[in-house]
Regions:
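Membrane-proximal intracellular helices of multi-pass ion channels
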Residues: 1-423
Length: 423
């Protein structure tokens, strides 16, 4: 037991080392002279982590711990093998060039490793504290504080940021409100914007859901307490298959965001003004689906670069609506459609009515349709000779009206200057 406890303390020590490496790597710029020794340090750290995890795997007495450690080992082996392949493929180049090539692989792998370890830590919190409400609120508070300090790192902003502004931005990102006190596009670097989008993603899905997503793969170690916490967060009716439900939420969310990013990319691929097009697409896909409203463009969607890109705006609207409805409503509706289609072509039950869609789904869908259609018609009529004059086509006017009807559902985006709108 003492040996197991010592290994756990060493595990936490290595977690701190990994965290420090990540923070200093992304948060500070030490110049070119530091790059090569830094990459060598990342390689040695990865080798050290692999050695320690291997030792823990063969000395651990708990089967559940072995599953977690095995995943860590596989991840570290993949990182090092990829580094080795890159080294062999570029062996004719200088060592400095090769080290710069493998640096992103090491950084990305160690970040993923740390996230896995963070999920284990959160699950440990579940076990020692039972109150789901406290765990829920506490996870958001911790996420906001961590995000605030990360946004204050030198490489996260162009000219620095106060703690108050960092705290406000982090809170807005985690709570997906879209409110900002600084310009996300101007005052934050790509590092800062990446921190913001991670906060949006964790806040939108919930760190508890992400934790349960990983727990699905280690089901022998998932606890009754953890099941209760997860059930409350994802609004699941019971404890049966609660971790599978969390898995479905995460996979559905990430899948929709990836597809949305691809469609957004197709809408801006010919736009020479927008840099880092796939990053732009992924950022706005996550921001739209989570109803956050953050943008990497100065002025947001009101920017002339995309203000008249109606294809982009319809994609964002669809993402906002899907994210705003929530996974329970979307899952129930798709289950209804699937069952209806199956029974439609099944001659044995062709006259049987499908009664799967819930009352909650009906209320939400009908209310959403009424608000969106009614809002679009009202804005089209009331703003036709005011803000809609800048749109030359009827389709453009309809798109602008629909976008302004959709975004008030906590999305935060805006393609119209509200100060110019009629009373």
């Amino acid at each position: 037991m003492k040996k197991e406890s010592l290994l756990n303390y060493l595990y936490r020590f290595f977690d701190i080392i990994v965290l420090l490496f990540i923070v200093f790597d992304f948060g500070y710029d030490f110049g070119e002279n530091y790059n090569s020794p830094h990459v060598v340090g990342l390689i040695l750290l990865s080798l050290g982590l692999l050695t320690f995890n291997s030792f823990k795997f063969f000395n651990s007495t708990f089967k559940s711990n072995k599953k977690v450690v095995l995943i860590n080992m596989i991840l570290l082996i993949v990182i090092l093998v990829n580094c080795g392949v890159i080294w062999l493929l570029n062996s004719s180049f200088s060592v400095y060039y090769i080290l710069q090539k493998i640096k992103p692989v090491l950084e990305g792998g160690l970040i993923l490793y740390f996230l896995l370890r963070l999920m284990v830590f959160v699950r440990y919190i579940y076990d020692i504290y039972f109150n789901p409400a406290i765990v829920f609120v506490g996870s958001f508070m911790i996420l906001v504080l961590i995000g605030s300090f990360l946004l204050m790192l030198p490489s996260a902003t162009t000219n620095g940021i106060t703690f108050t502004n960092a705290l406000f931005t982090a809170t807005s990102a985690v709570c997906v409100t879209g409110l900002t006190v600084v310009d996300t596009a101007v005052d934050f670097t790509i590092v800062g914007q990446s921190i913001i989008i991670v906060l949006i993603q964790l806040g939108g899905i919930g760190i508890l859901t992400f934790t349960s997503f990983f727990a699905f793969f280690f089901r022998s170690s998932s606890s009754f307490k953890e099941g209760l916490n997860t059930r409350d967060f994802i609004a699941n009716d019971g404890l049966k298959d609660v971790f599978r439900a969390a898995l479905n939420v995460v996979v559905f969310t990430l899948g929709v965001e990836l597809v949305g990013a691809l469609f957004i990319y197709s809408s801006i691929v010919d736009n020479a003004i927008i840099e880092h097009k796939f990053y732009f697409s992924l950022f706005h896909s996550i921001s739209a689906f989570c109803n956050a409203g953050f943008s990497t463009l100065p002025g947001g969607i009101l920017n002339t670069t995309v203000k008249f890109n109606y294809y982009l705006q319809w994609i964002l609207m669809l993402m906002i609506i899907l994210g705003g409805l929530g996974h329970n409503i979307v899952f129930n509706f798709f289950h209804y459609l699937k069952t209806y289609c199956f029974e439609l072509f099944d001659k044995k039950v062709i006259h049987k009515k499908v009664r799967i869609i819930t009352l909650n789904t009906k209320i939400v869908l009908y209310t959403t349709i009424i608000l969106l259609v009614g809002g679009t018609i009202f804005l089209f009529i009331s703003e036709y000779n005011i803000t809609l004059l800048q749109h030359d086509t009827v389709f453009g006017k309809i798109t602008a009206s629909a976008f302004n009807a959709v975004t008030p559902r906590t999305a935060g985006f805006s393609a119209t200057d509200y100060g110019e709108m009629g009373v």
